[in-house]
Amino acid sequence: MEQKLIIRQLGIRDYQKTWHEMQEFTDNRTDKSADEIWLVQHPSVFTQGQAGKAEHLLRSTAIPVVQSDRGGQITYHGIGQQIMYVLIDIKRLKTQGRDISVRQLVSALEQSVINTLADYGIESYAKADAPGVYIDGKKICSLGLRIRRGCSFHGLALNINMDLEPFHSINPCGYAGLEMAQLADFVSPQEADCGKVSPKLVEHFVTILGYNKQQIFNIKE
């Protein structure tokens, strides 16, 4: 039996509220629960991953810092950054013949961004030793996942049209001097719009993971 996939359009929402909702969803889901993708933007916030080191926050600012349970180091979220959280029952995918590891899920997320950027004529790439997506050495997309009971939550953050200045207050993802990029550096302001980019991003991701598109349902909240 093919499972439904629910796409939730959450708009702009507080990071901690969304994070706790992801935890609750994952803790309470059953083997019958549909997988979900949450599309959201967060007001300004720095988030530290589980292995996050304090020294990667270079200076104190008015922006709050939240200690998260995702993988990875510190990053920044702000308006104009498209976040895609993937709440997927990985162990169930394996029983359906889609033998996917956590590393393969990370690769699927990276490839969905690479394919999305290619739709705009932008060449990008992933790095085996530093998860994310890059353009000419600059990072345009950050990744961080948590796996609990064989199910994923957290996901990716793709810079679309945002203020990149707060990244200068951190070593992004733990890399000193790492420069950041965004879609608005390469396309018109009209094209660099989260509402236009997110459908392409989702389309590529669900295609890579092999979801039946007749079983995909969009919900705007």
From Swiss-Prot:
Annotated metabolic or biological route of this protein: Protein modification; protein lipoylation via endogenous pathway; protein N(6)-(lipoyl)lysine from octanoyl-[acyl-carrier-protein]: step 1/2
Residue span, BPL/LPL catalytic domain: 31-213
UniProt key word Transferase: yes
Residues annotated for substrate binding in this entry: 70-77, 142-144, 155-157
SUPFAM superfamilies named in the record: Class II aaRS and biotin synthetases (SSF55681)
Enzyme kind, highest EC tier: transferase
Subcellular localization(s) per the UniProt record: Cytoplasm
A biological process term (GO) from this entry: protein modification process
Protein name per the record: Octanoyltransferase
Organism: Mannheimia succiniciproducens (strain KCTC 0769BP / MBEL55E)
Gene: lipB
